[in-house]
Amino acid sequence: MGRKWANIVAKKTAKDGATSKVYAKFGVEIYAAAKQGEPDPESNSALKFVIERAKQAQVPKHVIDKAIDKAKGGGDETFVQGRYEGFGPNGSMVIAETLTSNVNRTIANIRTIFNKKGGNIGAAGAVSYMFDNTGVIVFKGTDPDHIFEILLDAEVDVRDVTEEEGNIVIYTEATDLHKGIAALKAAGITEFSTTELEMIAQSDVELSPEDLEIFEGLVDALEDDDDVQKVYHNVANL
C-alpha cells in the first residue's frame, strides 16, 4: 500500500504537535458537518465521524463543543470542499484538500504557495489519478489474519491488513470504510487510533536532499494554510 501508514502518522504527529492550528481545522470541519445536517452526532453520521476523528487527534472537548454550538446558533458561514493538485521537483506530486468559506481566497493562496515554493499547480485530475482513495483503520493488535477473517465475514472490501509495530493497519475500499468500522465494533473492537479516508500514492519517489528541502517547504506551506485540511504526496523520504 505504498508508504506505511504508521510512518505517516508518526511524522504527522511530530509535525502537528497537537497545535491550535490543528484544533482550528477540526473546528471548521465539525461546524461544516453540523451545518449540512442536524447538529447532533447521533442523527448526523458525517458529524459523528468527524468528531471521532477529532478525538483521535486529541482535539479538546471544548473545541468540539464550540463548533457544534456555533452551528446550533445559526452561524451563516457556508464552507465548500475543494481539491488542488500539483507537482514538485523530480516526479514528486502533491494534493491539497480544502474546506473554505471563500473559494477565491483559497485559489489565490494555493497558487501563490505553489509559485513561491518551487512547485507547479496542475489542472483537476493531473495528479489524483496516481493516488487511490482508501479507507484506513488503525488500532492496537497483533493478529492481522484474525482481523481479516472478521472483515471477510462482514463482506467488507479489504485491500490489505497488516501488523506494524503493535498496530493493526487495515486498508479498505473508500466506500467500505464505515462498513469496516462497524464490523470491528460488532466484534468488540471499539478503540481506534485512526479512521480516515486517505489518498495513497500508487508509487513513491525518493528525492535528493536538495529537492527534498524544496518539496518539504511546499508541503509545509500548504499544511499551514488555514483553508487546507489535508495534504497528500508521493515522496517516500519525507
Curated annotation (Swiss-Prot):
Keywords: Cytoplasm, DNA-binding, Transcription, Transcription regulation
Cytoplasm as UniProt keyword: yes
Keyword check for Cell membrane: no
GO biological process, one term: regulation of DNA-templated transcription
Highest taxon of the lineage: Bacteria
Record-level Gene Ontology MF annotations: DNA binding
One CC-aspect GO term: cytosol
UniProt subcellular location: Cytoplasm
InterPro entries: Integrase-like_N, TACO1_YebC-like_2nd/3rd_dom, TACO1_YebC_N, Transcrip_reg_TACO1-like, Transcrip_reg_TACO1-like_dom3, Transcrip_reg_TACO1_YeeN, YebC-like
Family to which this protein belongs: Belongs to the TACO1 family. YeeN subfamily.
Protein name per UniProt: Probable transcriptional regulatory protein YeeN
Name of the coding gene: yeeN
